[in-house]
């Protein structure tokens, strides 16, 4: 914009200055390419992780309990295998 001071009344120089200013403003408005990775880092930082396991005693007893183990042949095999190994707790 320093050349505007030299040719103050020239219409061509004034239009070039206005166009170049608008071009710069539009590039700043769209965002520079080197600022894009920062946006992706910010989005990934806010995600909560590690809270998938929410224990429930009822579900644990229904899936791995004594009644469920004895209700299927594979469950009986699990109980016998644990007895053979010497486990104190055979099921939940």
From Swiss-Prot:
A GO CC term assigned to this protein in UniProt: mitochondrial inner membrane
MF GO annotations: structural constituent of ribosome
The keyword Mitochondrion belongs to this UniProt entry's keyword annotation: yes
Transit peptide feature range: 1-46
Localisation: Mitochondrion
Main location: mitochondrion
Modified sites of kind Phosphoserine: 71
Biological process, per Gene Ontology: mitochondrial translation; translation
Keywords, sorted A to Z: Mitochondrion, Phosphoprotein, Ribonucleoprotein, Ribosomal protein, Transit peptide
Family of the protein in this entry: Belongs to the bacterial ribosomal protein bL34 family.
UniProt cross-references to PANTHER family, sorted A to Z: LARGE RIBOSOMAL SUBUNIT PROTEIN BL34M, MITOCHONDRIAL RIBOSOMAL PROTEIN 34 FAMILY MEMBER
Subunit-level organization: Component of the mitochondrial ribosome large subunit (39S) which comprises a 16S rRNA and about 50 distinct proteins.
Protein name (record): Large ribosomal subunit protein bL34m
Lineage, uppermost ranks: Eukaryota, Metazoa, Chordata, Craniata, Vertebrata
